[in-house]
Amino acid sequence: IANRHTHLLQVVGVIIALFFQSCAAHYATNMVNTPMLKQQGDLQIGGSVGHLGLNGQLAYAVSDNVGVMVNGKQHEAWYADDLATSNTVMFVEAGAGYYKWLSEHTIVELYGGYGLGEVNLVHAQKNTDITYILSRPFLQPSIGVQADFFSLNFATRFTHAGLRSDSIQLSGLFIEPAITTKLQFEQLSAIYQMGIVRTLHTDTPEMQVLPFWLAFGFQYNFDFTKND
């Protein structure tokens, strides 16, 4: 099983490398934040690493049914190939939404928000250095189940990503389903997430899309109501 997992990571790594070596503008999403907040005052802070780079996530329960979130991403890669390619991505988004526990073990969530970022693509041999501004609103419904120390969440994020430089303007509508599992040990949780990106509509077919992602990380849960 370990060999299969290693082989999968190698294949994914090759696909990612080929993706970022392309001269075309591209859209690489960030990790989906699936907080599954319990009640007013809950605060979560987490981070992950994976094929999307470094991701940071924060979520806070404003009330027993309203939550807010802030997410960030940083990715930097350099490839010593014939093109001498480098790629740097910085992205931050904020959102708010509604959550409701249907039972002791089942929750539904709906979050929406907006993000801004910057994508810098350099091909040294081709003397190309392009910076794109990334803008992206999102809408994210999800359903989750909680059993003791284990939780499973299925989210479907809809995004409209726009990439704009001095001479290029690209955009597309995407669907980004993701499955997130969390193993909780007291207030610390280990997170694993995998997801895919599919294009719903684009007027600019030259806009490339990173088709899937894997991410691993940890999340710390602050419960300020525990001692009330």
Sequence positions of predicted segments:
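Sec-dependent bacterial lipoprotein signal peptides
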Residues: 1-23
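Detector for intrinsically disordered, low-structure N-terminal pre-sequences
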Residues: 10-14, 95, 216
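Short glycine/proline- and aromatic-enriched beta-strand/turn motifs that initiate or cap beta-hairpins
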Residues: 23-78, 82, 223
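Outer-membrane beta-barrel transmembrane domain signature
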Residues: 30-32, 100, 115-228
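Outer-envelope beta-barrel architecture signal
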Residues: 37-45, 54, 64-66, 104-110, ...
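Generic detector of contiguous secondary-structure segments
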Residues: 49-61, 92-101, 139-141, 177-182
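Ligand-binding grooves and catalytic loops that recognize ribose/phosphate and carbohydrate rings
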Residues: 76-118
